[in-house]
Amino acid sequence: MLIVDAYSKIPKFYGMENITTAEVMDKLDMFQSRFGKIDQLGCWGLERISTDAGTQFTSTEFKEECQTRRVHLTLAAPEHQEMNGQVEVTWRTLRTVAHALMVHAGVPEVYVHFALMYTTDHIFPVLPIKDLINEDGDPTTPNKLATGTKPSVSHLRVLFSPSVVKKATAHVETQTLNMRHQAQNDFRGIFVGIPQHQKGYLV
């Protein structure tokens, strides 16, 4: 599921085991816990949800949940996804950038997940967007508006670039061997992204 904040334009992909109302609400809570701002009453600043006419959004359960949270729900007409413009435009941009990364690296379609996640989490949020400005009227980025901090790009790497991983230890049956003094203590791989909840790189 792709969620896009209307104010900052910051996007976030969430995998879903089941396409249900409960699963959707759970992902919305996850998005708010990361990017939402708490007002003076201790409430999340979610006021409106604009989405397509999927059954998980048109269900009575979802509508009741929105009413309970005092969230205004707007549904796009069936077969008219252009009414859900913000998400559709963002999705096209993410898809275009992701495919460009794959074409540049010459990797097959099985890597599309890594390309989409890297684009969504690390490339799109740090790029200025047309007509996106801060309170002073200056151009800004989705990450800056969403978090209030200047985005860092020093940790970013070229996606799908060749990498060498240092192997400090090796596990043989029940033993852990120190590889520091061995002739070959590293191996080659491909950089495919950055972990979400820890430092380092995915290879």
Give residue spans per PLM region:
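Retroviral integrase
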Residues: 1-96, 146-203
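Charged, gly/pro-enriched flexible loop segments at helix/strand junctions
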Residues: 103-171, 198-203
